[in-house]
Amino acid sequence: MNYEETLEYLYNQLPVYQKVGGTAYKEGLDNSLSLDKYFSHPHTRYKTIHIAGTNGKGSTSHLLAATLQQSGYKVGLYTSPHLVDFRERIRVNGEKISKQYVLDFVTKHREAYEPIQPSFFELTMMMAFQYFADTNVDVAIIEVGLGGRLDSTNIITPVLSIITNISFDHMQFLGNTLEKIAAEKAGIIKKDIPRSEEHTSEL
């Protein structure tokens, strides 16, 4: 496959939430944990900061990544969705992941991950984790995709958990009250791990 064919495979062969909606959502962490085991837990090779919330998590992720980079750290950044280019999702010091890395990752490991039947998000998340390990980042900013407690990214043990503003979103998955939605997003909070939370007046 070339790069364009690789993207076509990712978009058309794996369930993508933006294309097929809720049928792409895989509740639980089993797939993520299976992928993580196969790749030998790449996220343990650098520090991580986990960011959840309804509004502001993307801008917070980019701002924090830029601040850490200016302080001299080599910084990975994983966000979603992308606006134009798939590679916007995975960056190191502001530079997008290379097309060759995307191609090699998908083709090299295809026989291992296809039996797991990962979603688009689960596989691209693991691509990011492995890329950050391969490029020896000091710290990676990891933005939650959906919710928090059962989000694919919630296999990491971060040095800091951040929850930005919370409002109604993805109610079919997270619940129909702010309290239920907040509880799902608070699922990224780990015992004895520092956290930062933005106050939501309705709660």
Residue ranges of model-derived segments:
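Residue-level detector of conserved catalytic or cofactor/ligand-binding positions
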Residues: 198-203
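Inter-motif core of Ras-like GTPase G domains
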Residues: 154-165
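Short functional linear segments
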Residues: 1-52, 60-62, 66-71
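Short loop-to-beta-strand entry elements in the cores of soluble alpha/beta enzymes
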Residues: 190-197
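Catalytic cores of secreted/periplasmic lytic hydrolases that degrade extracellular macromolecules
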Residues: 57
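Hydrophobic/aromatic beta-strand patches that form the interior of the parallel beta-sheet core
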Residues: 49, 76-78, 160-162, 196
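Membrane-proximal helix-turn-helix segments that form the acceptor-binding/catalytic region
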Residues: 182-190
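ATP-dependent carboxylate-amine ligase catalytic core
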Residues: 22-29, 34-44, 70-156, 172-182
